[in-house]
Swiss-Prot record:
Gene name linked to the record: psbF
SUPFAM superfamilies tied to this protein: Cytochrome b559 subunits
Protein name according to UniProt: Cytochrome b559 subunit beta
Main location: plastid
GO molecular function: electron transfer activity; heme binding; iron ion binding
Amino acid sequence: MANQKTYTYPIFTVRWLAIHALAVPTVFFLGSITAMQFIER
């Protein structure tokens, strides 16, 4: 529970993969919706 940049546990990698696995499709989904809105108008 210390504020040190330790790479002993792979939690950082799993957390990074989880964040990107959720963020990338979300950004793509929002971008496609925005494109549909601009194309429709």
